[in-house]
Amino acid sequence: MQALYDVPAPAKLNLFLHVTGRRPDGYHLLQSVFMLIDWCDVLHFEVRGNGTVTREDLTSALPADDLVVRAARALQKATGCPQGVHIGVSKHIPAQAGLGGGSSDAASTLLALNRLWKLKLSRQQLHSIALTLGADVPFFLCGASAWVEGIGDIIRRLELEHQLPPAAFAVVKPEAGLDTRMIFSHPSLKRDSSCATISGFAATHYQFGSNDLQPVAQALCPEITQAINWLESKGLQGRMTGSGSAVFAQITHAVDLHDAPAAWHVKVCENLKSHPLADWVFG
């Protein structure tokens, strides 16, 4: 196998997000449920025998924080693989949205190259590499929606009685974006939420908890409030995902979403029972 085309990288929604503390090193401790949705970036991979890693959609110098290239190089370094790859990314998931697009791209890169380069790493081995790339990347390797704790490193798949029921969601990304660092460094951020339980979440699912980052994000980005108010005008209860600026609401009745501001991204999404690449890795 010398190439893989049309490899999906799904977005996520945080059904709730509680900040429960802060470690001495400054990292915040979180609790959240990460839910996979069918809004996907699409990646393409072609093996190169010279060991180089390139991106066809970036004609200028690669940014130092490009997660897709970092993921490929981290996998090379961890395994000593001499092969390279040429990567294309068709971006559909908006950036600075709290939807995890960049992290999902990195995870799909690890899964695809593990297969293309015939490395046969387990899910846990890929998880160790993913931890070096960013807090959300390990989740996208776990194969399904999950309960996530710590700094994103404690991940439990939602299965059996805790599995999420099928549902549709209106996802709205305002024109403005947000830098995650601005929110977590803000003095007004709530950092002492009580710890939740999976059983407590399972009792209400899509109505559980809140997003502790949302008040700060709304103060920094008024468009978030505008988007939530727009959803409420449709009879939908909106909340922010991740660190924003995207918001979402479960769709429980017929609703017309065609009058949103032209600069907003509005998409109706369904949750995914499993990651589309869940069976590409064992363990």
From Swiss-Prot:
Keywords: ATP-binding, Isoprene biosynthesis, Kinase, Nucleotide-binding, Transferase
Coiled coil location: none
Protein name: 4-diphosphocytidyl-2-C-methyl-D-erythritol kinase
Binding-site residues, ATP: P94, A95, Q96, A97, G98, L99, G100, G101, G102, S103, S104
Lineage, top ranks: Bacteria, Pseudomonadati, Pseudomonadota, Betaproteobacteria, Burkholderiales
Record-level Gene Ontology MF annotations: 4-(cytidine 5'-diphospho)-2-C-methyl-D-erythritol kinase activity; ATP binding
Broad class of enzyme this protein falls into: transferase
Gene this protein is translated from: ispE
Organism of derivation: Acidovorax ebreus (strain TPSY)
Domain of life of the native organism: Bacteria
Function: Catalyzes the phosphorylation of the position 2 hydroxy group of 4-diphosphocytidyl-2C-methyl-D-erythritol.
HAMAP family reported for this sequence: IspE (MF_00061)
Biological process, per Gene Ontology: isopentenyl diphosphate biosynthetic process, methylerythritol 4-phosphate pathway; terpenoid biosynthetic process
Pfam entry (one): GHMP_kinases_C
Pathway: Isoprenoid biosynthesis; isopentenyl diphosphate biosynthesis via DXP pathway; isopentenyl diphosphate from 1-deoxy-D-xylulose 5-phosphate: step 3/6
InterPro entries reported in the protein's UniProt record: GHMP_kinase_C_dom, GHMP_kinase_C_sf, GHMP_kinase_N_dom, IspE, Ribosomal_Su5_D2-typ_SF, Ribsml_uS5_D2-typ_fold_subgr
Signal peptide as annotated in the record: none
Protein's UniProt keywords contain Kinase: yes
Reactions mediated catalytically: 4-CDP-2-C-methyl-D-erythritol + ATP = 4-CDP-2-C-methyl-D-erythritol 2-phosphate + ADP + H(+)
Cysteines engaged in disulfide bonds, as pairs: none
Family: Belongs to the GHMP kinase family. IspE subfamily.
EC code(s) of this entry: 2.7.1.148
Residues at the catalytic site: K12, D136
